[in-house]
Amino acid sequence: MSDTLNRLAEVLEERKQAAPDSSYVASLYHKGLNKILEKLGEESVETIIAAKDAQISKDYSDVIYETADLWFHSLVMLSALGQHPQAVLDELERRFGLSGHDEKAARQPSA
């Protein structure tokens, strides 16, 4: 896994023990999963809007910035759920060489 993701995962874990007023991430953890998910939803919308704008303007700086926010808040969510980014990377690795249609067909049906 990239050094950046490892370092970020370590910081996110440290922030779980921090006082809510000591950092943005600590405050998110303190507010709970619903607040983290709300923020993740906001970042998703901002990323979509930035992508649409970039398609027209050909300026990709905002979509890169917003995607970084989206990834960051996704990592906060995973950390809050006790999951490490490596689990996502492992899943992506598992999908290499597997067609998207085959992967979707192989999933267990949701209840």
From Swiss-Prot:
Keywords: Amino-acid biosynthesis, ATP-binding, Cytoplasm, Histidine biosynthesis, Hydrolase, Nucleotide-binding. GO terms for biological process: L-histidine biosynthetic process. InterPro entries: HisE, PRib-ATP_PPHydrolase-like. Pfam families: PRA-PH (PF01503). Gene3D superfamilies: MazG-like. Transmembrane segments: none annotated. Its main location: cytoplasm. GO terms for cellular component: cytoplasm. It is an enzyme of class 3 (hydrolase). It catalyses: 1-(5-phospho-beta-D-ribosyl)-ATP + H2O = 1-(5-phospho-beta-D-ribosyl)-5'-AMP + diphosphate + H(+). The keyword Transferase does not apply. Coiled coil: none annotated. CDD domains: NTP-PPase_HisIE_like (cd11534). Its EC number is 3.6.1.31. PANTHER family: HISTIDINE BIOSYNTHESIS BIFUNCTIONAL PROTEIN, HISTIDINE BIOSYNTHESIS BIFUNCTIONAL PROTEIN HISIE. This is Phosphoribosyl-ATP pyrophosphatase.
